[in-house]
A protein has these predicted regions:
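Bacterial Sec-dependent N-terminal signal peptides
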Residues: 1-25
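Glycine/tyrosine- and acidic-biased, solvent-exposed loop/turn segments at the edges of beta-strands
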Residues: 19-248
Length: 248
């Protein structure tokens, strides 16, 4: 299953390197921003507003949707290098929260759906994905957990059915499929079991029916089929066409 991609479109847009000077905004003789600053769109609606001191953002910066509702709030540290961020859905519910360190996500970031249920948890070190990332179903139940190392998936990744039972267990190394993989039916019985090598199927892959009987055995060499055995002759042609795709 493709990992859910949620709420990442805001991020770096909110830092001072995206500020555009308006006529009413003040710079001193050294060209440094001072005091209240505000950016307006062509219709005169506020895009963001905040305070500067010696070119350093101070306190709370607010960003707005076109209808005037708050889109995000960033609260800066005194030196302007860190900012605690809260982003909002158009309905006013919290969308995301976390910290920026020098314009990069840092530490734990949490994301929420419009019902205020948790939808994802991500960890960063200076913008680099690390630690266990988690995504959730709309009701807040865990959908997937995947470890990251140096910005890439690394280790055992698990997906779950909505009732909490395991749906799949797959290993990654340096961002690629590597090692054992298994995909399960909701009752815990195996659906598909095999191995990966350098992001490709390698070795024996066994597919099962829901009753536990073997459906096929397919042997791969670096992603290329070298041998096929089908136990259900009535579905042999169909299965050959499918080659038992990895479940989403």
């Amino acid at each position: 299953m493709k990992r859910l991609k949620l709420l990442t479109f805001i991020g770096i847009l909110f830092f001072t390197n995206s500020v555009f000077v308006q006529g009413q905004n003040i710079t001193d003789s050294k060209g440094m921003k001072q005091g209240a600053w505000r950016k307006l769109d062509a219709a005169g609606k506020v895009i963001y507003e905040g305070q500067f001191k010696d070119n350093i953002p101070q306190g709370v910066f607010r960003y707005y949707y076109e209808d005037g509702k708050v889109r995000s709030e960033l609260t800066y540290s005194p030196d302007g290098k860190k900012a605690s961020a809260v982003n909002y859905h158009p309905n006013g519910k919290k969308m995301a929260e976390g910290v920026y360190a020098e314009t990069k996500k840092d530490g734990l970031w949490k994301y929420y759906n419009e019902r205020e249920n948790i939808s994802a948890e991500e960890y960063y070190t200076k913008g680099m994905p690390v630690g266990f990332w988690k995504t959730y179903y709309d009701d807040g139940n865990l959908l997937e957990e995947c470890p990251y190392k140096n910005g890439k998936k690394d280790g055992l990744s698990k997906q779950y059915f909505s009732d909490g039972s395991v749906k799949s267990e797959v290993n990654f190394k340096n961002g690629k499929y590597e090692g054992s993989a298994r995909y399960l039916f909701p009752d815990g019985k195996p659906l598909l079991v095999g191995q990966f090598k350098d992001d490709l199927k390698h070795g024996l892959w066994i597919a099962y029916k829901a009753n536990g009987e073997k459906e096929s055995e397919i042997t791969y060499f670096e992603g290329v089929i070298s041998e096929e055995i089908y136990y259900d002759k009535t579905r042999e042609a169909e299965l050959k066409n499918e080659v038992k795709e990895i479940p989403e």
